[in-house]
């Protein structure tokens, strides 16, 4: 990772410029070209430095529903259950944790009923109980990780 990569990551954590041609504006700001910056983002995704690049939506304002959920998965079944979840379009993230509840994921659906139905489907497919942790309150912390 070079200095341009660091500058790009730091800048993107605050979002793209809200203009007609955001990559061009960002390139001017960082002294590069739009094409170079797009290629850099792709390279950072490809090598695992970045795990995700995309918009953040306020699903409540869009009318959808989401929840944080967890499973307690026997180690011998972990990869198989992870593959089942990854095949579901409602599953946005899926992470291993060192805890009794060792598989954490986010569900996103069009309606709260969709969350209920998806949880029931996961439980039926895996034979495991889903720990459902719906959001009770929204906090905006302005999280930024300087690199």
UniProtKB/Swiss-Prot annotation:
<dbReference type="Pfam" id="PF17805">
    <property type="entry name" value="AsnC_trans_reg2"/>
</dbReference>
<dbReference type="InterPro" id="IPR040523">
    <property type="entry name" value="AsnC_trans_reg2"/>
</dbReference>
<dbReference type="InterPro" id="IPR053953">
    <property type="entry name" value="NirdL-like_HTH"/>
</dbReference>
<comment type="function">
    <text>Involved in heme d1 biosynthesis. Catalyzes the decarboxylation of siroheme into didecarboxysiroheme.</text>
</comment>
<comment type="pathway">
    <text>Porphyrin-containing compound metabolism.</text>
</comment>
<dbReference type="Pfam" id="PF22451">
    <property type="entry name" value="NirdL-like_HTH"/>
</dbReference>
<dbReference type="InterPro" id="IPR050684">
    <property type="entry name" value="HTH-Siroheme_Decarb"/>
</dbReference>
<comment type="similarity">
    <text>Belongs to the Ahb/Nir family.</text>
</comment>
<comment type="subunit">
    <text>Probably forms a complex composed of NirD, NirL, NirG and NirH. All proteins are required for the total conversion of siroheme to didecarboxysiroheme.</text>
</comment>
<protein>
    <recommendedName>
        <fullName>Siroheme decarboxylase NirG subunit</fullName>
        <ecNumber>4.1.1.111</ecNumber>
    </recommendedName>
</protein>
<dbReference type="InterPro" id="IPR036388">
    <property type="entry name" value="WH-like_DNA-bd_sf"/>
</dbReference>
<dbReference type="GO" id="GO:0016829">
    <property type="term" value="F:lyase activity"/>
</dbReference>
<keyword id="KW-0456">Lyase</keyword>
<dbReference type="InterPro" id="IPR019885">
    <property type="entry name" value="Tscrpt_reg_HTH_AsnC-type_CS"/>
</dbReference>
<dbReference type="InterPro" id="IPR019888">
    <property type="entry name" value="Tscrpt_reg_AsnC-like"/>
</dbReference>
């Amino acid at each position: 990772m070079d200095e341009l990569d660091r500058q790009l990551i730091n800048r993107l954590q605050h979002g793209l410029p809200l203009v007609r041609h955001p990559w061009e504006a960002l390139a001017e700001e960082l002294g590069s070209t739009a094409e170079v910056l797009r290629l850099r983002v792709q390279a950072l995704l490809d090598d695992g430095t970045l795990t995700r690049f995309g918009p953040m939506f306020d699903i409540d304002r869009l009318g959808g529903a989401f929840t944080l959920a967890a499973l307690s998965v026997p180690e011998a079944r972990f990869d198989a259950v992870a593959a089942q979840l990854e095949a579901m379009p409602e599953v946005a993230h899926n992470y291993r944790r060192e805890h009794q509840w060792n598989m954490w994921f986010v569900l996103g659906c069009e309606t709260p009923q969709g969350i209920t139905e998806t949880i029931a489907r996961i439980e039926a497919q895996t034979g495991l109980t889903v720990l459902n942790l719906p959001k009770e309150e929204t906090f905006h912390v302005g999280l930024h990780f300087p690199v």
